[in-house]
Amino acid sequence: MKTDVEIAQSAKMQPITEIADRIGIEPNELELYGSYKAKISLDIMKRIEDKPQGKLVLVTAISPTPAGEGKTTTTIGLGQALNKIGKKAIVALREPSLGPVFGIKGGATGGGYAQVVPMEDINLHFTGDIHAVTTAHNLLAALMDNHLHQGNELDIDSRQIVWRRVMDLNERVLRNIVLGLGGRINGVPRESGFDISVASEVMAALCLATDLMDLKERFAKIVVAYSQQGQAITAGDLKAAGSMALLMKDAIKPNLVQTLENTPAFIHGGPFANIAHGANSIVATRLGVKLADYMVTEAGFGADLGAEKFFNIVCRYGKLVPDAVVLVASIRALKHHGGVKKDKLGEENLEALAQGMENLKKHLENIQKFGVPAVVALNEFPSDTSKEIDYVFSQCAAMQTAVSISRVWAQGGEGGIDLAEKLVLATEQGSQFKFLYELNQPLKNKIETICREIYGAGSVKYAAEAKRMLQKYEESGFGDLPVCIAKTQYSLSDNAQLLGRPTGFEVNIRQVKLSAGAGFVVALAGDIMTMPGLGKVPAAENIDIKPDGEIVGLF
């Protein structure tokens, strides 16, 4: 079989104007970036506001493993399959960050015959959204440091500045730095650092805003520092929100591309799935449910992180109601959760599969708590045996959940027809969607509800500083915000080594942070890396461009 790059480079793309026309976007609502990429003007929302809503489908997964689950590939393949069975479908994905592209991943546009194209463009700069996020974020940092230098009228405590700078590359040496060295002319010296751009609160705010004015209001609420008296200092106090919003005036418009089979795809925004909510923009999702019969989107990591945040944060701010969930798993990944080492995953092991199946069952139970019907997509690998497949099917049947073998990586949309048909049936059951908690509950109650109900924790322990800050946030009027828990993605617990379905464990909340602009309180249950480093052999070393313009090494 061809490599992903070879498949993508041989794709027969249609002009993006034709893709847009097929889903009812008018020529004057498109802003073209060449022949195969476009932004969509938000003016379209006024024209289509009275159109009926299509079905909203969330693709999520079991707890991630090194064996791979194939969530993005499934999302794309499912969109293609829905179109094959006569349903008008659109897929929505997050846009890739350059850091992982040149670091370990080498690209993030699906795989096999379920990819979005033009692959090279999407992975490299795309339409400049992440650069706009970077610039808006760093403008705020520059205005704050200038305020310190010019007399510090707001009495900012330079030891309590929480706004760092960002860049869209993996750079470990920038995690902790000292600014302002070289004398008074160079500003006020202080410790700071850089995060990767997609970890920026600007990105999270972009993806939760409903329009540009909403985004500007969110920017004004961003807390950058605290005064000597302990008062929050915001971007609004620094008069930064207007300039930041101006920099984002194009970035807030969704990007339209296509899959290998010419299914329309929105790729817009890409916040972290741990310290933020890990889903593409609300703007793109709301547009998709108006233009399509089926809007298929995904959320980062496993259902304990991505799906929980999609339901409790994204659906709340976007006024969205999910109609069904596709839970992606593979027999290899389930065996990993049953304790099998990576080099043994190709061997039949029903005992380990049974243990690992508990992880899938827990995620299914969690989805049911939100009242949304689910279908399991079992990504096929050549090493899967008929006994193992039968076991997964029987266990899903016992939970009254449909399961389908997904072959979209090898066959494209054709390999997802059974999944698409079962999904359509699931959406017809009717969603009884509900939130897990109410916003008027205390912040600690919200955190503990997620830890107990979704993760399966027995108790939650707070560091003294975390307790103090939660109380401070509630006293400052932020108690009604949803919570966003940052923890390892590899386990249902906060300990990456606890695979399968651990129970009765204690979750340790070490720190809490306020993302007032994005609109949530982050509870950190573990060390979260917000600026990755490059590995021993970065993907960048194998990426090149030939004299004829052919790009090699992006995979």
From Swiss-Prot:
CDD domains: FTHFS. SUPFAM superfamilies: P-loop containing nucleoside triphosphate hydrolases. InterPro entries: Formate_THF_ligase, Formate_THF_ligase_CS, P-loop_NTPase. One of its GO terms (biological process) is tetrahydrofolate interconversion. It comes from the Bacteria. Keywords: ATP-binding, Ligase, Nucleotide-binding, One-carbon metabolism. Pathway: One-carbon metabolism; tetrahydrofolate interconversion. ATP binds at T65, P66, A67, G68, E69, G70, K71, T72. It catalyses: (6S)-5,6,7,8-tetrahydrofolate + formate + ATP = (6R)-10-formyltetrahydrofolate + ADP + phosphate. Its EC number is 6.3.4.3. Gene3D superfamilies: Domain 2, N(10)-formyltetrahydrofolate synthetase, Formyltetrahydrofolate synthetase, domain 3, P-loop containing nucleotide triphosphate hydrolases. GO terms for molecular function: ATP binding; formate-tetrahydrofolate ligase activity. The keyword Ligase applies. Pfam families: FTHFS. Belongs to the formate--tetrahydrofolate ligase family. This is Formate--tetrahydrofolate ligase.
